[in-house]
Amino acid sequence: MIRQKIAVLGPGSWGTALSQVLNDNGHEVRIWGNIPEQLDEINEHHTNKRYFKDVVLDEKIKAYHDLEDALKDIDAVLFVVPTKVTRLVAKQVSQILDHKAVVMHASKGLEPGTHERLSVILEEEIPNHLRSDIVVVSGPSHAEETIVRDITLITAASKDLEAAKYVQKLFSNNYFRLYTNPDVIGVETAGALKNIIAVGAGALHGMGYGDNAKAAVITRGLAEITRLGVKLGADPLTYSGLSGVGDLIVTGTSIYSRNWRAGDALGRGEKLEDIERNMGMVIEGISTTKVAYELSRELNVYMPITCAIYQSIYEGKNIKEAITSMMSNEFRAENEWSK
């Protein structure tokens, strides 16, 4: 593939890891963010120690303070910013971008209030003449492993197969591989909702439960993710793929997962405000829990795990009581995933 100019919006852990992948593939990478000290550190020391203490980045990766400079003559732009600011950043991009580019995002969440997926936000805020169909980059991936070039397989989802194939070629190499998928709804809902289940799995660990309980939450969590996703128009097969069960396994079982760690701390009795302050990173599963709970009520979708996490976070119910109370729910058949 010919060398491409890529703006990566968001110098967090995943944005930094994906920047390295793109740089390894010979592309010009421009990272943009809003913390001057962090951007200066990337340019002067080639490190991002807030997320990776022992990683030295290639000096060809440049960080930009000015969004206009980062977007100049780009071939593609990758959004890796928190869900809550995606719309704001997209508005800024639409005011600056003066030519058509491939628009991608690698964030996982649903917008509070509107309940919208991130690709929908980008479609609303960036005019058609400035972008391709949105490409979603999602799947089972810890930034801590990708940054050290561990083997990682994820998904490029788009309604436009050619745009998805472009992104597939853009990122793929001998340690990082993408598969295309036309089911944008399925890929995005899987990526967002698995964070809730990861909080639940972490909470079980924090409360001292074993592998049996964690496996139950993960598999029944997949069932309720699928129920809501299908109601929203997703293909149920997507949830058995990389962006579905794959991402759920990686996020629901690992200490690298900030959502799992948040759940673990909740399970040990820590207060949410203390957890968020100590972690110093966005815990998408917290805000997504509220959105998913509201959607489940609106669409009449049975989501008991999401409901239990919601009750604990937003209604003050004891986390152990909220989760263990599910054991007395009405009996159901396992294959009632669609109800």
From Swiss-Prot:
Q: Some GO term, biological process aspect, for this entry: which one?
A: glycerophospholipid metabolic process
Question: Where does the UniProt annotation locate this protein?
Answer: Cytoplasm
> Which reaction is this enzyme known to catalyze?
sn-glycerol 3-phosphate + NAD(+) = dihydroxyacetone phosphate + NADH + H(+); sn-glycerol 3-phosphate + NADP(+) = dihydroxyacetone phosphate + NADPH + H(+)
Which UniProt keyword terms apply here?
Cytoplasm, Lipid biosynthesis, Lipid metabolism, NAD, NADP, Nucleotide-binding, Oxidoreductase, Phospholipid biosynthesis, Phospholipid metabolism
**Enzyme Commission code:** 1.1.1.94
EC class of this enzyme?
oxidoreductase
Which residues take part in binding sn-glycerol 3-phosphate? K108, G139, S141, K194, D247, S257, R258, N259
The main place the protein resides is cytoplasm
Pathway linked to the protein: Membrane lipid metabolism; glycerophospholipid metabolism
Question: What residues does NADPH bind to?
Answer: S13, W14, K108, A143, R258, V282, E284
Name a GO molecular-function annotation. NAD binding
Catalytic-site annotation from UniProt = K194
Q: Which GO terms describe its cellular component?
A: cytosol
Q: Which Pfam families match?
A: NAD_Gly3P_dh_C, NAD_Gly3P_dh_N
SUPFAM superfamilies named in the record: 6-phosphogluconate dehydrogenase C-terminal domain-like, NAD(P)-binding Rossmann-fold domains
Say what the protein does.
Catalyzes the reduction of the glycolytic intermediate dihydroxyacetone phosphate (DHAP) to sn-glycerol 3-phosphate (G3P), the key precursor for phospholipid synthesis.
Q: Record's family?
A: Belongs to the NAD-dependent glycerol-3-phosphate dehydrogenase family.
**Name this polypeptide is given:** Glycerol-3-phosphate dehydrogenase [NAD(P)+]
Which organism does this sequence originate in?
Streptococcus mutans serotype c (strain ATCC 700610 / UA159)
